[in-house]
Amino acid sequence: MLVDTGLGLISELRARLGWAALLQIVPVTVVAYNLLWFIYTSFFSSLRKIPGPFLARISRVWEIKKAATGNIHEIVMDLHRCHGPIVRIGPNRYDFDTMEALKIIYRIGNALPKADYYIPFGLPSSPNLFDVQNPARHSAMKKQVASLYTMTALLSYEAGVDGQTIILKEQLQRFCDQKQVIDLPQFLQYYAFDVIGVITVGKSMGMMETNSDTNGACGALDAMWHYSSMMAFIPHMHAWWLRLSSLLPIDVPIKGLTEYVEQRIIQYRLKAAEFGDDDALKGENNFLAKLILMERQGTVTSTETQQAVGLNIGAGSDTTANALSSILYFLYTNPRTLRRLREELDTHVKEDPIRFQQSQSMPYLQAVIKEALRLHPGVGTQLTRVVPKGGLVIEGQFFPEGAEVGVNGWALYHNKAIFGNDASVFRPERWLETKGNLNIGGSFAFGAGSRSCIGKNISILEMSKAIPQIVRNFDIEINHGDMTWKNECWWFVKPEYKAMIKPRAA
């Protein structure tokens, strides 16, 4: 609708004025608008005293330039260290790093809507559970698939995860025997993809066994996050670009993964049709089988099935892979912590792989996971919400309707006022101590409130399986070779390093 209106307006102006006049008017209008906005925000707005970069006061160019460096998470942390709990990152965008702001902005009741920033993370004509902006619509969509994420459902996926965790151990042993330097974060993404493939469509993608990016899925997701995280700053251009790309011979990176998902959906529908009833699917412990059953019962549509499957694979694999990579990095570069975790595992774990319910009763393991997610939250950008009618008071400052506000997880989790002077230190023990509101922010790595990640327990299931398996059997020499620890933020903050797998020494 917006694309058609915009194209119609341009055509009408061109017809009335001609191209020459139109090309003169557009830049003058843009300059005039930004000048007037600067005058308003500098001298008349109630938010004029909020600190931040000068360019961010009048334009989104500052945020776009910083995001394009792949280092926006570090830059926003530095802004908060310099200016305090509220900083301006755009003409109408404000970032926070406090628990008070988190509880207000991501409240469960009367939830704030997501900003237009999220539009490029899906299709404008068919919003998914992640990018849908309206809270009521999100609630309705979430109810449709909530049964797939219950604890009962989670435990039904465990056997499939066990199978892939055993393959993980076997492949790491092969790297160990060959004394091979590997891109460990990349291999952990293969593990995450294979696991989420089994959970979602009932079949591994075979990445670990081939040590390769089958279907180009990893590369496709990287390209998608690059695109969406930058297009998010000009979200209404997303629909224009999609229309343009459909008319040009442009390669679509996600094509291989999309075809894989579509093939599995077709196979399951044919399987259900062949038997003529639901019995063929009831014994299958994966998302797709359950969704096809829901389709046949009329509770979800075929489009919603495809959306749910695609979102589960896309978001689930990167979230888990990045978390596993950071957990192992912090563990194997902190020998004291590694020793304490091994003591807990050696004392209490007899099964191989560990049972999920047992892992949940192991306090130090869970503290290690929480602490790694604190130091390295998966998402490096602000989780943006729009202030509703009537405005909001956050950190003592009134924000009018329409202002875009949010908390950056990296800034929050590195805030010394919350986590102490050792906020930048990997110390899992902090989660075993009782310090007031510390645990309130403990799950913000997966978002907060009604819009927190619906699949977070699946990610925790994978972590709780893989980490004990690796720690009990292997030593890892981090930064072996010419690649040191590096992070790049394209929505997700992806760790990069190389490692050598070795037999456990003690």
UniProtKB/Swiss-Prot annotation:
**What CDD domains does its record include?**
CYP57A1-like (cd11060)
Q: Name one GO molecular function term.
A: heme binding
**Cofactor(s), by name:** heme
Root EC class? oxidoreductase
What are the TM regions of this chain, as residue ranges? none
Q: What Pfam families does this protein map onto? A: p450
Q: What is its EC number?
A: 1.14.-.-
Q: Which UniProt keywords apply?
A: Heme, Iron, Metal-binding, Monooxygenase, Oxidoreductase
Task: Write down the SUPFAM superfamilies for this protein, in alphabetical order.
Answer: Cytochrome P450 (SSF48264)
Assigned protein family: Belongs to the cytochrome P450 family.
Q: What function does this protein fulfil?
A: Can detoxify the phytoalexin pisatin from garden pea. Pisatin is an antimicrobial compound produced by pea in response to infection by plant pathogens.
Can you say what this protein is called? Pisatin demethylase
